[in-house]
From Swiss-Prot:
Name recorded for this polypeptide: Nucleotide-binding protein CLL_A3342
Family of the protein in this entry: Belongs to the RapZ-like family.
NCBIfam families xrefs: PRK05416.1 (NF003828)
Source species, domain of life: Bacteria
Main function: Displays ATPase and GTPase activities.
Presence of the UniProt keyword Cytoplasm in the record: no
UniProt entry keywords in alphabetical sequence: ATP-binding, GTP-binding, Nucleotide-binding
Residues engaged in binding ATP: 8-15
SUPFAM superfamilies to which the protein is assigned, alphabetical: P-loop containing nucleoside triphosphate hydrolases
Length: 294
């Protein structure tokens, strides 16, 4: 089990670091009193591997409880319980700027100057910083920079492509564009199988409709261009730290063209070693047209 204690200066990025750890599959607990860490660690270690990555956020907001941290760490060490400490730091100038931008007061100086609170906090955290296994200075970091750094230290070293969940979603414009779409493509310019009597009753999941749609010159050109676009976009989304991408492909009713093309894009993404899923939101809607609604 990997057991990470996250601490550091207020405003240095502990919240963002914790979100990154959650994205990496860590079970995160915020501001657990240090005296409870021993019991929590024992429970985690007895969990039959159900919890194998844990992160505890400990900061100065714990007040007097924070003073118990060193006693707890010594206890864990004596009992050969492996843990690591991550310390988030930043320059005084950057911390002051962040507090001013957020219009928050410093927890150690709620009615006074932010700088006074920072000075006090540095003094109180000096010993825990000296014990830290990893110190990350976020002074020059944007959120994505910190995310990349967290992945570097705490990721599972799986291919970055596998860390972006891609959903290819077919839909019908008559039923509305999916509200959670990241990318939306309109394929209503492609010849419609709906007007072919022998194909009308089938969907884009059926071979006859799929073959008809994919052999169209417009489809061939569109799919190639879309694949080129995704080969450019996906690595950049991963670099940015995006965790989920929803690609919505729509036709009129969401039954023929969008389904066939969504399936084709889904297959190409998986061949390209990406983690993709396929959903057809409206493929059965036209079957229920004319039915009375409750």
């Amino acid at each position: 089990m990997r057991f990470v204690i996250v601490t550091g200066l207020s405003g240095a990025g502990k919240t963002q670091a914790t979100r990154s750890l959650e994205d990496l599959g860590y079970f995160c607990v915020d501001n657990l009193p240090p005296k409870l860490i021993n019991k929590f660690a024992e429970l985690c270690s007895q969990g039959d591997g159900k919890i194998d990555k844990v992160a505890l956020v400990i900061d100065i907001r714990g007040g007097v409880f924070f003073d118990d941290l060193f006693e707890t760490l010594n206890y864990l060490k004596e009992n050969e319980f492996k843990y690591e400490i991550l310390f988030l730091d930043a320059s005084d100038e950057v911390l002051i700027k962040r507090f001013k931008e957020s219009r928050r007061s410093h927890p150690l100086s709620p009615d006074g100057r932010v700088l006074n609170g920072i000075i006090q906090e540095r003094s109180k955290l000096r010993e825990i910083k000296d014990r830290a296994d990893i110190i990350i200075d976020t002074s020059k970091y944007a959120i994505r920079d910190l995310r990349e750094k967290m992945n570097e230290h705490y990721g599972d070293n799986i291919e970055s492509e596998k860390q972006l969940s891609i959903t290819v979603l077919s839909f019908g414009f008559k039923y509305g564009i999916p509200v959670d779409s990241d990318l939306v493509f309109d394929v209503r310019f492609i010849p419609n199988p709906f007007y072919i009597p022998e194909l009308k009753q089938y969907s884009g999941n059926d071979k006859s409709v799929k073959d008809y749609v994919l052999k169209q010159e417009e489809t061939i050109t569109f799919v190639e261009k879309l694949q080129d676009m995704l080969e450019y976009l996906v690595p950049n989304y991963i670099k940015e730290g995006k965790r989920q991408l929803i690609i919505s492909i729509g036709c009129t009713g969401g039954r023929h063209r969008s389904v066939a093309i969504a399936n084709e894009i889904y297959e190409r993404l998986n061949k390209g070693n990406y983690k993709a899923k396929i959903e057809h939101r409206d493929v059965g809607e036209d079957l229920h047209r004319g039915e009375k609604k409750l």
